[in-house]
From Swiss-Prot:
GO biological process: regulation of DNA-templated transcription; transcription initiation at RNA polymerase II promoter
Protein's name according to its UniProt entry: Transcription factor E
UniProt lineage: Archaea, Thermoproteota, Thermoprotei, Thermoproteales, Thermoproteaceae
Top-rank lineage group of the source organism: Archaea
Function: Transcription factor that plays a role in the activation of archaeal genes transcribed by RNA polymerase. Facilitates transcription initiation by enhancing TATA-box recognition by TATA-box-binding protein (Tbp), and transcription factor B (Tfb) and RNA polymerase recruitment. Not absolutely required for transcription in vitro, but particularly important in cases where Tbp or Tfb function is not optimal. It dynamically alters the nucleic acid-binding properties of RNA polymerases by stabilizing the initiation complex and destabilizing elongation complexes.
Family from the record: Belongs to the TFE family.
Alphabetized UniProt keyword annotations: DNA-binding, Transcription, Transcription regulation
Stretches assigned to the HTH TFE/IIEalpha-type domain: 1-93
Length: 170
């Protein structure tokens, strides 16, 4: 499960910041927090990974918004507020469970839509159109001009149902 979690961290950050490098950096941060099994400040993480504190904070705050890292707030002896970050098995379980729940909901909606109507798809750009939309557009994709193809719903529903069953086991 740790590998799946690290993949989610890497891809989420890479997508948000439009930078595969940031994604790899976020993966290193999460991996280090998990392996050390202790709460660390953002300054300490930056020093251990030899990266800037600003980058570390940006990554950690984004991961916090996605509930991919845990954060604890405490007051120091000199009354400063200090945040410490951690990753444990519970965080990983919640992160993967949340992603699986979202995927299940979307797949269920897609299965429901496929059972309720007929669909056509463009072979080039893979846009999906309902029967009414395909008729209104004359059976031609408005994006690329290719002829729309009928989607065999039963086959697609079976594939999606198998994926849904696997996700429900998580």
């Amino acid at each position: 499960m740790k590998d799946v979690y690290l993949y989610i961290v890497e891809k989420s950050v890479a997508w948000e910041f439009d930078s595969p490098e940031y994604g790899r950096l976020a993966r290193k941060v999460a991996e280090m927090l998990y392996e050390r099994k202790e709460d660390l400040t953002d300054d300490r993480i930056a020093i251990l990974l030899n990266i800037s504190t600003a980058e570390t904070r940006r990554i950690l705050q984004y991961l916090m918004r996605l509930n991919l890292v845990g954060v604890k707030k405490r007051t120091t002896e000199d009354y400063r507020i200090e945040y410490t970050w951690y990753v444990d098995d519970e965080i990983i379980k919640q992160a993967i469970g949340g992603r699986a729940r979202t995927a299940r909901e979307k797949i269920s909606m897609l299965i429901r839509a496929l059972t309720e109507g007929s669909y056509y798809i463009c072979p080039n750009c893979h846009m999906r159109y309902s029967l009414d939309e395909a008729v209104n557009k004359g059976g031609v994709c408005p994006v690329c001009g290719a002829e729309l193809e009928y989607v065999e719903s039963l086959e697609e529903i079976n594939k999606l149902t198998k994926v849904l069953q696997k996700l429900e086991k998580l």
